[in-house]
């Protein structure tokens, strides 16, 4: 696919599975562009798709936008015949996928605090733009700045966008990988949202 230029007038309109979103809870963040590679008939790497992702959803009382960059249904990933491309396009993933992976970008409106939640997965969380407070259910917290990474090992947590002292939007990206069930003191910890 040829390089695509972003129309500045459309920078706050994001494609959803139902069409374009007319309002965006985190104005000022540039549109995320996804570049997917593959191979030509000679086995050389080529760009096969450039877009903004297949699945977008306004979440958190219309205060955040989730963009699924890519997802897979198995590990190792089957890429022959482009079966992974078909799966990612046709299936909006849940929080995480058993034996698979999810790459999710979330744009947060200013001062948004997510609910306390737990995913039974190993999550790599990267601050792309802004500053966030990662709060654990124990009460412990850490400030994360652009480029910082959290390794979330299925613990209950929440995110607070503190960018510009809570006056600006922020963006994070997560890569979620499946993990075995978490058992502590004979208690099986499940996914939850409070």
Curated annotation (Swiss-Prot):
Keywords: Oxidoreductase. Transmembrane segments: none annotated. Pathway: Secondary metabolite biosynthesis. InterPro entries: Cupin_2, OryJ/VirC-like, RmlC-like_jellyroll, RmlC_Cupin_sf. Cupin-domain-containing oxidoreductase; part of the gene cluster that mediates the biosynthesis of virensols and trichoxide, fungal natural products that contain or are derived from a salicylaldehyde core. The pathway begins with the synthesis of the reduced chain in virensol C by the highly reducing polyketide synthase virA via condensation of one acetate and 8 malonate units. Belongs to the virC family. This is Cupin-domain-containing oxidoreductase virC. It comes from Hypocrea virens (strain Gv29-8 / FGSC 10586). The gene is virC.
């Amino acid at each position: 696919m040829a390089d695509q230029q972003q129309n500045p007038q459309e920078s706050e309109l994001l494609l959803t599975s139902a069409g374009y979103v007319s309002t965006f809870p985190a104005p000022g963040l540039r549109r995320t562009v996804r570049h997917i590679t593959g191979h030509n008939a000679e086995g050389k790497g080529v760009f096969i798709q450039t877009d903004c992702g297949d699945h977008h959803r306004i979440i958190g009382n219309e205060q955040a936008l989730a963009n699924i960059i890519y997802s897979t249904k198995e590990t190792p990933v089957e890429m022959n015949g482009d079966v992974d491309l078909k799966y990612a396009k046709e299936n909006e993933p849940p929080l995480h996928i058993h034996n698979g992976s999810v790459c999710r970008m979330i744009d947060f409106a200013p001062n948004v605090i997510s609910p306390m939640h737990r995913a039974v997965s190993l999550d790599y969380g990267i601050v792309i733009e802004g500053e966030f407070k990662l709060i654990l259910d124990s009460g412990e917290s850490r400030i994360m700045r652009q480029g910082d990474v959290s390794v979330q090992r299925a613990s209950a947590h929440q995110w607070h966008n503190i960018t510009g002292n809570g006056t600006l939007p922020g963006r994070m990206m997560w890569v979620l990988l499946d993990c075995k069930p978490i058992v502590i003191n004979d208690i099986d910890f499940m996914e939850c949202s409070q």
